[in-house]
Amino acid sequence: MKISCEIIGKVDSGDVSKISMENNNGVVISTLTTGATLQEFLVPMETGALKNIVLGFSDFEDYYKNNLCACQSIGRVAGRIGKASYTHNMVLYSLPKNEGDNCLHGGPKGMQVQNWNYVTNLNDDYVETKFIRRLYSSVDGFPGDVTVSISYRLNNNNRLTILFEAFDVTESTVFNPTNHVYFNLSDKQDLSSHELQIYSDYRLELDSELIPTGQKINVDETNYDFRKTTDLLPRIEANNGFDDAFVVGGGTCDHVKEVAILHDKESGDGIEIFSNRNGLVIFTMDDIEDNIYFARDKGKMAKRREAIAMEAQTLPDAVNHKGFGDIILDKGHSVNYEIGFQYFNSSR
C-alpha cells in the first residue's frame, strides 16, 4: 500500500491538498482537503485501466459552482432540519436557513465548505487519511464549538471506511454527518445497467418541502421496495426520481450493519454499503444544472440521473421526531459514526 500528497491550490485558509491512497490490488482513493471530499474511487478494469465509480471534479473550485455537494463531507447535520430549529432541554435553538425556511446539510457554512487539516497513516492493515477541524458556532451558526475528525481508511480487501468523530464540544449541539457520495459503477452516463438492494421495510413520509412528517410508510408493493435486488432505472422512471430516506439496520444505531448493495450488471462492479446508523437517503439527480462537467465524463456535460447518491446517516430531522434517533451531542461527550463501502466485482 502507498500514499501520496500534493498541493493543488490555495484558499483563504491555506493550501488545498489532494491525498491519494492505493492498496495492493490497485484500488485508489483520492481525497481533497476542501470539504474533506472523496474525489476519486478508482477501481481497475480488465484492460488494466482505472475507472472512477464516484462523481468528482478535476478542479477543486468546481465543487462550489453547483449545489450537488458531490462526495463531500456533510455536517454538522446531513439532510434537512425543519424550520431550521429544534428544542432541547426546553431551549429553542435556531439554525441558519439555506433552503427556504429550513436548514439543509449544515447550512451555508457547513463542513463541505471548510478546508481541513490532515495527517496520514500507513500500516500493515490499512492506509489512512485523517482530516480534522475545529468547527465554531460563530462560523456555521450551530450551537457550541466542536472538534471533528473524518478518517478515510482503505484496506487490502478493497474496503473504504469513513469514520466520523466529534469531541471537545463546548455546549450541547447536534451532530449527524455523512458523505454525499454519488455512485455510477458503469462507464456510461446513466444507471441503465444498475441494480439496487436496500435492506429496508420502511421509508419516511415527506411533506412538500421534503421534511419528514414523523410517519414511517411500509414499502411493500410500492416503487420504494428494494428488499430484493431490483433494476434501478425503471424504478427511477416510474417514481419520477428519488430523494427519499429509508429506515435501515432495524431502525437502530448500535453496530455496523450492511444496509444496501449497488451493482452494475455489465461490468460486474458493485458496492456493499455498511453503516452503524438507521437511515439511508438516496437521491437520483433529477434536477441538475447546466455546465457541470465531472472528471469521469471526459469532457461531456453531466446528465440528469447520471448517478445515485447514497447517504448513510441517522434519519433526517431526527432532532425533531421521537424515535428517529438521537443526534444530540452534549458537553463532555463524544460520538463516533462509521460508513463502509466494500468494493467487489461479481464477474472475476
Curated annotation (Swiss-Prot):
The biological processes this protein is annotated with in GO are: galactose catabolic process via UDP-galactose, Leloir pathway; glucose metabolic process
Where, in this chain's numbering, is substrate bound?
80, 243
Q: Which biological pathway?
A: Carbohydrate metabolism; hexose metabolism
Q: Name one GO molecular function term.
A: aldose 1-epimerase activity
Reading the lineage from the top rank, the first entry is Bacteria
Q: Name one Pfam family in it.
A: Aldose_epim
Reaction(s) catalysed (UniProt annotation): alpha-D-glucose = beta-D-glucose
Active-site residues, record numbering mapped to chain: 180, 311
Catalytic class of the enzyme: isomerase
GO CC annotation: cytoplasm
Q: Name the EC number(s).
A: 5.1.3.3
What UniProt keywords are attached to this protein's entry?
A: Carbohydrate metabolism, Isomerase
Family matches, as InterPro entries: Ald1_epimerase_CS (IPR018052), Ald_epimerase_bac (IPR013458), Aldose_1-epimerase (IPR015443), Aldose_1/G6P_1-epimerase (IPR008183), Gal_mutarotase_sf_dom (IPR011013), Galactose_mutarotase-like (IPR047215), GH-type_carb-bd (IPR014718)
Known role: Mutarotase converts alpha-aldose to the beta-anomer. It is active on D-glucose, L-arabinose, D-xylose, D-galactose, maltose and lactose.
Q: Which family does it belong to?
A: Belongs to the aldose epimerase family.
UniProt name for this protein: Aldose 1-epimerase
Q: Encoded by which gene?
A: galM
